[in-house]
Amino acid sequence: MRLTAKQVIWLKVCLHLAGFLPFVWLAWAINHGGLSADPVKDIQHFTGRTALKFLLATLLITPLARYAKQPLLIRTRRLLGLWCFAWATLHLTSYALLELGVNNLALFGQELITRPYLTLGIVSWLILLALAFTSTQAMQRNLGKHWQQLHNFVYLVAILAPIHYLWSVKIISPQPILYAGLALLLLALRYKKFRTWLK
């Protein structure tokens, strides 16, 4: 049975809750001692992982809609992408304000040079910024065929963001490897599209 437009609306409501509730949990954890002895790192990793989860969810929508024969699922893709950008922005902000501090923001450029994984992160965020800014139907009409060309850069983010995560952790752990593996799997599902580009 295919989803109806009304069911998709309720699904969007649920997805908005899924995007907002992690923020509620994080705020509670900060105020009630739910973080470790290094709360700044906890906040950075939590916001970054949440952004990655929404990135993977965004990439999942197209193959899921195709294989499950649920075309209306595509209507949730923009919503998930915007939540990905929102959490990526919180991730960047937590690094800039909590790690560097307001008085040391001038060091950000130097950090990008000395820590290449930060470069991957900021490139990913800039791409997400462009995609979020052009995600409306009006921008899609204005950009025409260039809109899809621009939004294909989400696949580059799907490569850079997991590498950024893997590179940023001090020790090898299963979680960043899992995210990288899921990203590769979701990209592999699009092999026909990539093969067409190479022709």
From Swiss-Prot:
InterPro entries: Fe3_Rdtase_TM_dom, MsrQ-like. Its main location: membrane. One of its GO terms (molecular function) is electron transfer activity. It comes from the Bacteria. It is a multi-pass membrane protein. Pfam families: Ferric_reduct. GO terms for biological process: protein repair. The chain crosses the membrane at residues 8-28, 82-102, 116-136, 153-173. Keywords: Cell inner membrane, Cell membrane, Electron transport, Flavoprotein, FMN, Heme, Iron, Membrane, Metal-binding, Transmembrane, Transmembrane helix, Transport. It is found in: Cell inner membrane. GO terms for cellular component: plasma membrane. Its cofactor is FMN; heme b. Binds 1 FMN per subunit. Part of the MsrPQ system that repairs oxidized periplasmic proteins containing methionine sulfoxide residues (Met-O), using respiratory chain electrons. Thus protects these proteins from oxidative-stress damage caused by reactive species of oxygen and chlorine generated by the host defense mechanisms. MsrPQ is essential for the maintenance of envelope integrity under bleach stress, rescuing a wide series of structurally unrelated periplasmic proteins from methionine oxidation, including the primary periplasmic chaperone SurA and the lipoprotein Pal. Belongs to the MsrQ family. Heterodimer of a catalytic subunit (MsrP) and a heme-binding subunit (MsrQ). This is Protein-methionine-sulfoxide reductase heme-binding subunit MsrQ. The gene is msrQ.
